[in-house]
From Swiss-Prot:
Function noted in UniProt: Displays methyltransferase, positive regulation of the poly(A) polymerase and transcription elongation activities. Involved in the modification of both mRNA ends and in intermediate and late gene positive transcription elongation. At the mRNAs 5' end, methylates the ribose 2' OH group of the first transcribed nucleotide, thereby producing a 2'-O-methylpurine cap. At the 3' end, functions as a processivity factor which stimulates the activity of the viral poly(A) polymerase OPG063 that creates mRNA's poly(A) tail.
Quaternary organization: Interacts with poly(A) polymerase catalytic subunit OPG063. Interacts with OPG109 and OPG123; these interactions might help linking transcription to capping and polyadenylation.
GO biological process, one term: 7-methylguanosine mRNA capping
Protein name from the UniProt record: Cap-specific mRNA (nucleoside-2'-O-)-methyltransferase
Residue numbers annotated as active site: 175 (for methyltransferase activity)
EC number: 2.1.1.57
Effect of residue 56 to R: Complete loss of poly(A) polymerase stimulatory activity
Length: 333
């Protein structure tokens, strides 16, 4: 890996300051991957998002409606983290697939095994009234092959727009990956929001999270065009090909790889119920607790030693097979 000196990572898509033409040959590269990397990616992004809402006084007393949540192993960590901070949250986890048994038996967690449609969304809104709703969506439909088609993506994004319109959440975190320009069908609309980049995404993932906080006005929509798709592809390829393969030499941390640098800046914003002498100590504590929870071996993190014994994930099969499958260089995940 090449070295670089950086003041901060790219946290949002708009911050990426360069671009690179996509090279199909990159598909032949062997990707480095951590165990349970998909759950790690989701956990870090959602912990950052919910901590941001906590900082704004939005989180306490809310119901998190998570659509497309299975297997949801990482959600147990999120639930326990905020529960231990004394933040009152209810969780409604909805997916047509079954959830990890680690989520069973929790009074503040409701598990629903079904897919959503407009009628069911209206019933959720009626059931939860007058509670404030925080929406997290990780919907993903694939009608064939390993990757969702552009038609699949457009269907998912139309459904996410309906979720916002009906549930009227105070905040949302939506799945977002722009269709590739060579697979373009038509222009479409997504909610206006901040496009958060994700550490520990697969090597050439073009996916990000669309974060929004709503202040009472109608949902603002942004039109996405083929020209936008070209911009997304070039900037995300630059991020994945060049930036994420760097070692950050001025980053004082046991592992100086860019994704750990990115993770550091996310975890530094997270509240804890104990004090630490430095921000670095807090981030190390959080990272180690997350890696232990997800059973990610300490050998994957350089120079982190003296870890407590890791707990076992309830079942190796609790992780969706689709999340562990080999993906194309322009991965949706």
């Amino acid at each position: 890996m090449d070295v670089v000196s950086l003041d901060k990572p790219f946290m949002y898509f708009e911050e990426i300051d360069n671009e690179l033409d996509y090279e199909p040959e990159s598909a032949n590269e062997v990707a480095k991957k951590l165990p349970y990397q998909g759950q790690l990616k989701l956990l870090l992004g959602e912990l950052f998002f919910l901590s941001k809402l906590q900082r704004h006084g939005i989180l306490d007393g809310a119901t998190v409606v998570y659509i497309g949540s299975a297997p949801g192993t990482h959600i147990r960590y999120l639930r326990d983290h905020f529960y231990n901070l004394g933040v009152i949250i209810k969780w409604m986890l909805i997916d047509g697939r079954h959830h990890d048994p680690i989520l069973n038996g929790l009074r503040d967690v409701t598990l629903v095994t079904r897919f959503v449609d407009e009628e069911y969304l209206r019933s959720i809104k009626k059931q939860l009234h007058p509670s404030k709703i925080i929406l997290i969506s990780d919907v993903r439909s694939k009608r064939g092959g390993n990757e969702p088609s552009t038609a699949d993506l457009l269907s998912n994004y139309a459904l996410q727009n309906v979720m916002i319109s009906i549930l009227n959440p105070v905040a949302s975190s939506l799945k977002w990956r722009c269709p590739f320009p060579d697979q373009w069908i038509k222009d479409f609309y997504i909610p206006h929001g901040n496009k958060m980049l994700q550490p520990f995404a697969p090597s050439y993932s073009a996916e990000m999270r669309l974060l929004s906080i709503y202040t009472g006005e109608n949902m603002r929509l942004t039109r996405v065009t083929k020209s936008d798709a070209v911009n997304y592809e070039k900037k995300m390829y630059y991020l994945n090909k060049i930036v994420r393969n760097k070692v950050v030499v001025n980053f004082d941390y046991p592992n100086q790889e860019y994704d750990y640098f990115h993770m550091y800046f996310m975890l530094r914003t997270v509240y804890c119920n104990k004090t630490f002498p430095t921000t670095k100590a807090k981030v190390l504590f959080l990272q180690q607790s997350i890696f232990r929870f997800l059973n990610i071996p300490t050998t994957s993190t350089e120079k982190v030693s003296h870890e407590p014994i890791q707990r076992k994930i309830s079942s190796k099969n609790s992780m969706s097979k689709n999340r562990n499958s080999k993906r194309s260089v322009r991965s949706n995940k």
